[in-house]
Amino acid sequence: MVASAYSFMASTWASEEWKKTVIRQRLVEWRNQNTVTRIEKPTRLDRARALGYKAKQGIIVARVKVEKGGMDKQRPNSGRRPKRMGVYGFSPAKSLQFIAEEKAARKFPGLEVLGSYYVAEDGKYKYYEVILVDPHNPVIMSDPQFNWLKNPANRGRVFRGLTSAGRRTRGLLKSRGLKGTIHYKIARKKKEREQKKRHEASKYYRLAKYDRIPGK
């Protein structure tokens, strides 16, 4: 079976030599750009076409950079231990890809997010490219592949977690095993409760080590 052009694109993008030469040079330019930058064509054409991208009117691509790391929480003025200030160690309950889609949707309020994909990352940012569609463009409204976006039920779909990244964050996408499903969250919470019981600071753990509970 002859390999397609898109398979060659995917293998080239995954090669370490490509990342060390081409991607590293592009990251220097991308870091100095705005948070949301509209681009003429997708950087990873194979991923864009897999998500439904077409080079036609009403469809644009935007590159979004999202800062890596935890949340930038405000430091409280009232006194407390540094451990209890709630500043460090907090991460958002959404993936960075989901956040990138929301940033692009706010930049282009008249468009709907079709999908997004990972591009690259450096020490400070992760870069994603988001595909946006104008649901009221005549070309889009006459295309059966995209005219479902004009339905009012799909308005603001990215802010309701209806994109692929949003559904993955909500635990609704299927995967091998429990991970990636709503049942994985239940199993994870159950495991966390058991670990909390066995912690040395837990009253349950301290009393469990006695043959007889004190005071009884």
UniProtKB/Swiss-Prot annotation:
Coiled coil segments of this chain: none
Pfam family, one: Ribosomal_L15e
GO molecular function: RNA binding; structural constituent of ribosome
Recorded GO CC terms: cytosolic large ribosomal subunit
Record bears the keyword Ribonucleoprotein: yes
Record-given protein name: Large ribosomal subunit protein eL15
UniProt-listed NCBIfam families: PRK04243.1
Entry-linked HAMAP family: Ribosomal_eL15
UniProt-listed InterPro entries: Rbsml_eL15_core_dom_sf (IPR024794), Ribosomal_eL15 (IPR000439), Ribosomal_eL15_arc (IPR020926), Ribosomal_uL23/eL15/eS24_sf (IPR012678)
Biological process according to GO: cytoplasmic translation
The entry's keywords: Ribonucleoprotein, Ribosomal protein
Keyword match Ion transport: no
PANTHER family: LARGE RIBOSOMAL SUBUNIT PROTEIN EL15 (PTHR11847:SF4), RIBOSOMAL PROTEIN L15 (PTHR11847)
